[in-house]
Amino acid sequence: HNVVDYVASAEYKVFAWGLNDPTEGNPTSIRDPWTDASPYTWNSDGMSKYPTTRGNNAIAQDNPTGGSTYINNYRPQSPNLIFSYPWSPTATPPSSYKDFSITQLFYTTNRYHDLLYSFGFNEAAGNFQVNNGNKGGKGNDFAIVNAQDGSGTNNANFATPPDGSPGRMRMYNWTTARPNRDGCLEAGIVIHEYTHGLSNRLCGGPANSACLNALESGGMGEGWGDFYATAIRLKPRDTKNTNYSMGAWAANNPKGIRAYLYSTNLQTNPYMYTSVNSLREVHQIGTVWASMLYDLMWALIEAHGGTYSANPVFRNGVPQDGRHLSMKLVMDGMALQPCNPNFVQARDAILDADRALTNSANKCTIWKAFAKRGLGYGAKYDARNRTGSNK
């Protein structure tokens, strides 16, 4: 019998899941959005209830000084767990709407925790939770998520120690527009950063968070972040001809912060596997990898249909739509690849993931998608002279 009654209703006024940024909709009040992945709700860790933006999965606060302490930093307080605060696109400075920003960051982080849990990023896999119950892994490692962090601008980052130590996200303000913009309000940036935690915990196992620190593997770390951010923002009206940017709202630039848009069109985005030969920066390499995964997602949507429900529908552990299936296969691949993998090894890990999950039902679809940008059967890794293959 539990000492704490975990089941307390909560409400968050935020940009809902699937809305990437303020250009896509308006804040709405969302009640009790957690899933079974958060049995204590988002505002309890099973031992204590918190009338603020703290719980089992995350602790969200502002951090204007950019310092490393967080526990005594400012958070909105709401004894009735109604986190409803004003925001307007003309409000300035961002600190004037810090309650809204912290709530939004808390919501997006928790919502992504719950989605990834459904795909298998759970306690035993090394996820970010204080209280793991008796479900394996190491606890005491929620995500420390800082809104309006003063240690930088026009960027964001996520630090991932091994399982059992908290991850730390720093979200910055962007000085690219007047008034300045708060990166917390662009869900894709939050998702990109949290995905560093996912990939670093899965690749090489949760006890080793140093398996994505080579140039090519570090590039894929950036690419996975862009891929999940983009897959989550897809809309029902989208088709394989829909192009997406990364970071466009925060950067105040329709092209976003990458060299090319994410597009299945090789004229719009000409990146190929051999493009990596001339790239020396992880975000550039990541854009190549995410472009391949964007192609893969649309190939699986064409094969299985696309659903735009917030949560996947599973049958025998398999997401029943191509969008969520791509997210599941890509995530499973992270855990199957070697430490510091290259593109060829990561591709093979996704094929292995499909074999384990569906008995290779999508083998041809996956090969064809990767071959499109030169990561086909004959592709070979060499740090200075990669060989492409369209077959």
UniProtKB/Swiss-Prot annotation:
BP-aspect Gene Ontology terms: proteolysis
Propeptide residues?
1-9
Cofactors? Zn(2+)
List the CDD domains hit by this protein, alphabetically.
M36
- Cross-referenced SUPFAM superfamilies: Metalloproteases ('zincins'), catalytic domain
Indicate which residues are glycosylated according to the record: N173, N243, N385
**What domain of life?**
Eukaryota
Role noted for this protein:
Secreted metalloproteinase probably acting as a virulence factor.
Name the UniProt record assigns to this protein: Extracellular metalloproteinase 3
Originating gene: MEP3
